[in-house]
Regions:
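Acidic (Asp/Glu-rich) sequence patches and key acidic residues
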Residues: 1-146, 150-153, 157
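Cysteine-clustered segments with highest specificity for TGF-beta superfamily mature ligands
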Residues: 166-167
Length: 171
């Protein structure tokens, strides 16, 4: 479990290779080493074909796909953003890893989600828990939906390629 600070940073999903995954898993327990791999290798390469920027919409996306909070979700929808294996334990950065099997399940879980379903979930988020007064509105929902569509496309492609996935965000 990790601490989420209000007014989250910009999140990015990266569809990574088996070699990159092995490096990250070998570094688990050493937050500095994990960050070096993420920042100096994965982020630095910025492989546009295998990433999805979520800006700050990742927060609302996760809440819509889970119980409305930032707790780790369960099952494929809960894995989409903050689920999976936590590779970084500090409060300054989040790195969550999904296996290719989990990526496939997330892709399948996201496929049928409609804009109406997402809107209903979005407006059930507790404004006090969201931490940004006045942000739960139609304009922010449209922003969230636009990024969600990119996330869904990302998972479809990552699943088709059998890739691992990490979600990263700095706090």
């Amino acid at each position: 479990m990790f601490t989420i600070i209000s007014m989250a940073g910009r999140g990015v999903l990266f569809a990574i290779t088996e070699d990159q995954t092995q490096q990250l898993r070998a570094a688990r327990g050493d937050d500095g080493a994990v960050l070096t791999i993420v920042q100096d290798e994965i982020e630095q390469a910025w492989d546009e074909a295998h990433l999805c920027q979520t800006d700050k919409a990742w927060d609302a996306i996760h809440r819509c796909l889970t119980d409305g909070t930032l707790r780790n979700g369960h099952g494929p929808l809960g894995w989409c953003i903050l689920g999976g294996e936590q590779l970084h334990q500090g409060d300054s950065y989040i790195v969550c890893l999904l296996t290719p099997e989990q990526v496939q399940q997330v892709a399948e879980g996201l496929r049928p989600i409609s804009k109406e379903w997402m809107r209903t979930r979005y407006f059930k988020i507790d404004p006090a828990d969201y931490g940004v007064p006045g942000m739960l509105n139609d304009e922010d929902f449209e922003y969230t939906w636009e990024y969600f569509e990119g996330v869904r496309d990302y998972y479809t492609k990552a699943a088709a390629e059998g890739r691992w996935s990490i979600f990263t965000v700095d706090q």
